[in-house]
């Protein structure tokens, strides 16, 4: 049963990594990053349940990661919207605005 839970976390993680590497669209890259965060949360909840039942550190860490992911999504969406207003494009390879 432990292996099934790890596969449940590893499968979306691999999909998110693949999507993050191959995507040209910024919104798709942000969605893949959120998928990676959710896969990590599944593993954070899975490990404490099989190692020690008395501790809830995995669940607390998972809630913290959800809060950080929500802030990352809000800031990332705001940056994408600001760049879209200036450049009229959301393609990753055309984002050279933040280089200078």
UniProtKB/Swiss-Prot annotation:
The cysteines covalently paired via disulfide bonds are: none
What is this enzyme's EC? 7.1.1.-
Mainly resides where? plastid
Extract the InterPro entries matched here. Answer: NADH_UbQ_OxRdtase_chain4L/K (IPR001133), NUOK/Mnh_C1-like (IPR039428)
- Enumerate the UniProt keywords alphabetically: Chloroplast, Membrane, NAD, NADP, Plastid, Plastoquinone, Quinone, Thylakoid, Translocase, Transmembrane, Transmembrane helix, Transport
According to its UniProt record, where is this protein located?
Answer: Plastid, Chloroplast thylakoid membrane
Q: What residue ranges are annotated as transmembrane?
A: 1-21, 29-49, 63-83
Question: Mind telling me which HAMAP family this protein's record contains?
Answer: NDH1_NuoK (MF_01456)
Name the record gives this protein: NAD(P)H-quinone oxidoreductase subunit 4L, chloroplastic
């Amino acid at each position: 049963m432990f292996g099934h839970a790890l596969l449940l976390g590893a499968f979306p993680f691999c999909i998110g990594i693949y999507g993050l590497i191959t995507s040209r669209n910024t919104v798709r890259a942000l969605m893949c990053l959120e998928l990676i965060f959710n896969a990590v949360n599944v593993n954070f909840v899975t490990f404490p349940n099989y190692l020690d039942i008395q501790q809830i550190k995995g669940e607390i860490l998972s809630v913290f990661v959800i809060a950080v992911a929500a802030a990352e999504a809000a800031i990332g969406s705001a940056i994408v919207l600001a760049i879209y207003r200036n450049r009229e494009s959301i393609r990753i390879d055309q984002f050279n605005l933040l280089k200078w």
